[in-house]
């Protein structure tokens, strides 16, 4: 809208390595897409130091494109609860990865952790009280589409979901826990 010919942003990630966490770029309806890129934190810091010294010219060389949309699917496994089968506990990770990653940490580790947890729960002699649903969500990186599709498909059962948890970046130290639970539910979380 203001006439920019390109856009560069500081990485959305928090790691200090040279791989920027690029996220996704969207443009409002009717706006012409422009080249956009994320800089790693060290590179963004260097650019900020240079900008502080005076005007800076940046050349952008991107090798990317749009190949259209594709259909993907959530993968869902379920262990039926023994005494409260209508109450559901969801654990999961997501199947896709961002463009600079191998997918090992984000999020094959999360899928592996939750699949292993589901397997261990399924091996127990005493089955869980509630139904355990293990989900490998599709298309998280482009806008949480797998999670949104699951929510839409189960909208009439939302009150039966006791808790939903996703393991993302599951192979390192746990550095945060986030919840959208209402304040009244936070003591249970």
Give residue spans per PLM region.
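Soluble metallo-hydrolase cores and metallopeptidase-like ectodomains found primarily
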Residues: 24-104, 116-119, 123-131, 152
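Short amphipathic alpha-helical face segments that pack within enzyme cores
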Residues: 108-116, 145, 149
